[in-house]
Amino acid sequence: MKITGETASAVFESIRQQILSGALTPGQLLPPVRDLALALGINRNTVASAYKRLDAAGLAQTQGRRGTVVSARPTPGAQEGTQAGSGLHDLASGNPDPRCLPELRALLPARPPRLYGTPTIDPVLATLAHQQLAGDCPAGYALELAHGAVDAIERVLACWSVAGDPVAVENPCFLGSLNTLRAAGYEALAVAIDGEGMQVEALEQALAAGARAVLLTPRAHNPTGASISRRRARALRQVLERYPQVLVLVDDHFALLSRRPYHAVIPPTTRRWALLRSLSKSLGPDLRLALIGCDAETAARLRLRMAPGTGWVSHLLQDAAAAALGSARVAARMKRAGDDYVARRELLRQALQDEGIVVEAEMDGLNLWLPLGRDSQPLVMALAQRGWQVRGGEVFSVHTPVHGLRITTATLTATDARRFARDLREALAA
């Protein structure tokens, strides 16, 4: 490799160009700071500064005594949804039932065009959003919007984190969150979960290991369906109280449909925090809108970051969300939808139990999670041969493989539940 430069910026740019051109490849070790400084005739601090910039840009990664290596290029991970045209019965997509979603176009009110300089958050939506957030956010919170939960996670993390920063996440973890961490170059620290949410000792270990942020799901964890209990929330708060500098993100994506109570995990000592509530499951994934309640400094950084890009979330989307959230008819429809999702998941749980397959009853969300003691892929393939498409649990894993099946039950009928349960029993026995 031919690295040149007399300043930190010049050394950074020289290495950057070689990485982009392919002359330096992922995993390749960069020269030790001392050696490169001697070769270039410059101060070691200059080289160290250049390497630090490469790390922050996600181009290289400092690995302690091993030195600094060129980072692997991020690749797209598994995505929610399934490909159109598949002949398989879709129990893998993670989608809500389209029949449970309101017809937003019919709700849209006639509004005058919004122009530059219009307040970025519509006051009608703001009032309705505060009704959704006020009781669950710490006092003095600020309201912001994003283009869905994953966009909110990406934006809030970017307010306070740089590539290489450790972020504590549940294992297994929601696909959108995993992809966000990979794309931004954050280091995911796996935190084991159980039926009551993040395990306290596992979170403590991640924080002691240097986690700069914690991302967790209070209800309807995807893929397991777990919800944080009151007892667990209290224990998690006690741990987080000792780390006031750590950013806490709470992804309450299923809030409007959940049948589980919300138990707050953000302690009063936490300085940087955000509670995210997406409208995708309740009003439709294409709405691309999430409500964010957060501390004032995070809100200011979100606005600063939004301003030179999209500027604001479209007022057409805000109008649709406000019309739906303010409609008694839509509220009743969401109530029926939430009840329906519980009933459909219970149909499958009972059908599996009838076939001798015991599944945890305390779940929430659009899916049923079936833990396995082995790699799920042979079972996924066996079910595909019988006409079913499900998600193998390994795609949700953070470092340590998690074996299981995520089965989307949002549109499942009683007949299909019984057929699937029989086919699953046969596949397990094969």
Name each region found by the language model.
Residues 251-252:
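Walker B catalytic acidic pair
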Residues 96, 219-221, 281, 412:
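Short glycine-rich anion-binding loops that position phosphate/pyrophosphate groups of nucleotides
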Residues 274-352, 357-360:
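PLP-dependent aminotransferase class I/II
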Residues 114-244, 256-274:
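Conserved core of the PLP fold type I
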Residues 166, 187, 247, 358, ...:
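Residue-level detector of anion-binding/catalytic polar loops
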Residues 1-117, 121, 127, 307-314, ...:
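N-terminal basic, amphipathic alpha-helical segments
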Residues 278-279, 393-397:
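Short, solvent-exposed loop/turn elements at beta->coil junctions and helix N-caps
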